[in-house]
């Protein structure tokens, strides 16, 4: 089926009862609410585009009062001929205060995960210390201290 067109794979009746949708963007991005019912689209840095994003957490990582982004992803569930989405190892993006985001090197951020992340969740312990839990597909979650 790899060399066939979509018209050769499906009969006309399938198309007649199908809902057609169009994607305007194929990159990882944020939509910024302008407050008047409109949104401004902003692509995320190129390092984020290396793999899919499956989990995002908004936290002020560096204590400057602006929400930064922590992201993780990967998808290993594709058929072998399509390969895996596994080129990123998690992303930390620091907010410059004007919604400009700068990617942080893994050594600087301390956030490096080769696994297939399905969800990110931040939480505090009873003393108020912040942590990030990464839910890993078919594995134990990983927990990172955010205040160290």
Predicted regions and their residues:
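Beta-propeller-forming repeat regions
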Residues: 1-148
